[in-house]
Amino acid sequence: MASHILLVGIGGFCGAIVRYFFSRKLNSGKLPVGTLTVNLSGAFLLGAMAGANLSTTTTLLLGTGFLGAFTTFSTLKLEMAQLQLKKEHRLFILYTTITYGGGIALAYLGYWLGSFFR
């Protein structure tokens, strides 16, 4: 059990740092491209991991830990609220559509591709 917690912690530490890098580099305009990038790529990668049916150790380290910290639901919601408050309604709709539609599509694609590595 302690080893599982350590795996999640190590993965989470690394994932959070990488997400911070993406946010700092890409979230400079009206559309939060950094958050969009981490959430879409995270959906794809987690789908691929699920499709590949990886070991518990790998899933804890990379799935729960790294990708759990790399992707972000709370920042997404804050940025969506900020777009609405700034009356950026078109960007809000675009961001929401790409995030949810793209995330679901990429998770399915990742799962499908990952299943070839079982």
Curated annotation (Swiss-Prot):
Pfam families: CRCB. It is a multi-pass membrane protein. Na(+) binds at G68, T71. The chain crosses the membrane at residues 2-22, 31-51, 56-76, 91-111. It comes from the Bacteria. InterPro entries: FluC. It is found in: Cell membrane. The keyword Metal-binding applies. One of its GO terms (cellular component) is plasma membrane. It catalyses: fluoride(in) = fluoride(out). Keywords: Cell membrane, Ion channel, Ion transport, Membrane, Metal-binding, Sodium, Transmembrane, Transmembrane helix, Transport. Na(+) is not transported, but it plays an essential structural role and its presence is essential for fluoride channel function. GO terms for biological process: cellular detoxification of fluoride. The keyword Cell membrane applies. One of its GO terms (molecular function) is fluoride channel activity. HAMAP family: FluC. Belongs to the fluoride channel Fluc/FEX (TC 1.A.43) family. Fluoride-specific ion channel. Important for reducing fluoride concentration in the cell, thus reducing its toxicity. This is Fluoride-specific ion channel FluC 2. It comes from Desulfitobacterium hafniense (strain Y51). The gene is fluC2.
